[in-house]
Regions:
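Pyridoxal 5′-phosphate
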Residues: 1-421
Length: 421
């Protein structure tokens, strides 16, 4: 049974957009529950991207011929679509290769611009993906700023109390950099409360998991920077975006140097191009950016509110059904802040074995491992009632999933438990 957001006819059209859902894996219908790692790709988006490459492609911004003009127009139109999608200005949107590049570029630029310097404090949470953890840790060792943490409880949940405790320990952080939604626990963070609590800090949001299913308004949230990836919202790999308030982007040193990002170059000095081009050195992933624009068109044609409600419905069902299994330990909150994914373990069975059996015997794609969040695994181990293996199984849904997919997962987990005793 699909989400009640779609009629049977509408859902049939959705399934037709993703041909891989019609294939079999090990003799079973594919049940794709690894959307937090990457989503499936839309036939419409791929078709339009192919047409762009075959009939309209050229390098951009550099020539006056027709193909260059067409390609540049498509590229800049995609930027405008991204800006509209998050309620920003187009000059505040910088194309990147994805969230990891966006955060790394931003961290390096903040440090090199002197906006984060020796003696400053950067506040992040204990549930961060390595992409929002490692850059801060490493650069703090070279530039002398401190990294402090909003602590998670033993379920991996960031609570209001933990945010307030961090406020009492770190009264005036220069930067607060936090995920919008944990890729391990599925918790959607209270961004508004964090903004209100740390009014004067530069607020950076890792939107990789959140933006595929929840509308983000950067102006309403008053975030300073937002990064996200296209491949987690059915766009191709290798494309993402960095949003920054124009007043802050103007102050930042570019993170890449080369062609197109300059205004004037002499043998002695350089002046930079205007926003956002001073951050887009060299030839960009033109086709990827254009495809990201097509992706936004497709998602908006479905109604993003419908997608959001669909994910909420599937998430609730996933959490409810897994909670009925007494041999399954679930991590993260058990309320409505738990969205789109669930990380869990089967008592007595290693996560890799669980995922392998689900794939081989049921055609279910899940993720097992530490999910690029090794420090969080040590937090979860403290509160675990089982012999915690420093990794988990993760099942994650998107709008093309069904309740039947979740039912098959539950049956698969019962089989796993019987098989391993």
């Amino acid at each position: 049974m699909h989400s009640t957001e779609w009629s049977d006819e509408a859902f049939c059209r959705i399934i037709q957009e993703f041909p891989v859902l019609n294939r079999e894996v090990n003799g079973k219908r594919l049940v794709y529950l690894d959307n937090a790692a990457s989503t499936l790709k839309s036939r419409t988006v791929i078709s339009k991207m192919t047409d762009f490459y075959l009939n309209h492609y050229s390098n951009i911004h550099r020539a006056v011929h027709t193909l260059a003009s067409e390609a540049t127009s498509e590229y800049e139109m995609a930027r405008e679509k991204v800006a509209r999608f998050i309620n920003a200005q187009s000059e505040e949107v910088v194309f990147t290769s994805g969230t990891t590049m966006g955060i790394n570029a931003l961290v390096n630029s903040l440090v090199r611009s002197g906006m984060v310097r020796e003696g400053d404090t950067v506040l992040i949470s204990q549930v961060e993906h390595h992409a929002n953890l490692v850059p801060w840790i490493r650069l703090s060792k070279f530039f002398g700023f401190k990294v402090e943490y909003i602590e998670a409880d033993n379920t991996g949940t960031i609570t209001i109390d933990s945010i307030l405790n961090a406020k009492s320990r770190v009264n005036s952080p220069k930067v607060v950099s936090i995920t919008g939604q944990s890729n391990v626990t599925g918790q959607v963070m209270p961004i508004e409360f964090i903004r209100e609590t740390f009014k004067d800090a530069i607020l950076i949001i890792d939107g990789a998991q959140l933006i595929p299913h929840k509308k983000i308004d950067v102006k309403a949230l008053n975030v300073d920077f937002l990064v996200f990836s296209g491949h987690k919202m059915i766009a191709p790999t290798g494309i993402g975006a960095l949003y920054g308030k124009s007043t802050l982007l103007e102050r930042l040193e570019p993170f890449l140097y080369g062609g197109e990002m300059i205004d004037k170059v002499t043998f002695e000095d350089v002046t930079f191009n205007v926003l956002p081009y001073k951050f887009e050195a060299g030839t960009q992933d033109i086709g990827g950016a254009v495809a990201l624009g097509y992706t936004i068109d497709y998602l908006e044609s479905l109604g993003f509110e419908n997608i959001q409600r669909c994910i909420e419905e599937l998430s609730k069902y996933l959490l409810e059904e897994l909670s009925k299994l007494d041999f399954v330990e679930i991590y993260g909150p058990r309320d409505e802040t738990h969205q789109s994914l669930v990380s869990f373990n089967v008592d007595g069975v290693h996560p890799h074995d669980v995922s392998q059996v689900l794939d081989e015997d049921f055609g279910i794609a899940t993720r097992s491992g530490h999910h690029c969040a090794q420090p969080l695994m040590s937090v979860l181990a403290k509160g675990s009632r089982i012999d915690f293996p420093n990794s988990t199984v993760r099942a994650s849904v998107y709008f093309y999933n069904t309740k039947e997919d979740i039912d098959i997962l539950v049956e698969g987990l019962k089989y796993v438990k019987r098989w391993f005793g």
